[in-house]
Amino acid sequence: MGRVRTKTVKKSSRQVIEKYYSRMTLDFHTNKKILEEVAIIPSKRLRNKIAGFSTHLMKRIQKGPVRGISLKLQEEERERRMDFVPDESAIKIDDVKVDKETLEMLASLGMSDIAGISQVETQQAMAPAVFGRPAGRYQR
């Protein structure tokens, strides 16, 4: 079972990352030295715990936004994503390519005269490759 981190460790790690994000790294020893410089931490053990959790959070931040940490960089990224309007729609309806079966289905529904629909040659599906032992009892 893992160790439980106290509220003090979590809170101080988040504060340090918010203020000194540009200086923090994914390396524990570097983060420990940075903490020594920027914060007054009463004990070596507490400093190491905060540095360890800060390193853990930095690794999580690399993967995506972390709850409880508001970084200006992440906020700008979020705003950019919200305001982004593509030049060209991802859903192009100028030319829709369908197989023979779908075209026949549309014809049966009386919708074969829709503009922009073209037929595409379908490829034969390959039989799936079987890996591992054969099913059933193994014979020698």
From Swiss-Prot:
GO cellular component: cytosol; cytosolic ribosome; cytosolic small ribosomal subunit
A molecular function GO annotation: mRNA binding
Membrane-spanning parts: none
A Pfam entry, by short name: Ribosomal_S17e
Domain of life: Eukaryota
Gene Ontology biological process terms from the UniProt entry: translation
Leader sequence residues: none
Family membership noted in the UniProt record: Belongs to the eukaryotic ribosomal protein eS17 family.
This protein's name: Small ribosomal subunit protein eS17x
Organism per entry: Arabidopsis thaliana (Mouse-ear cress)
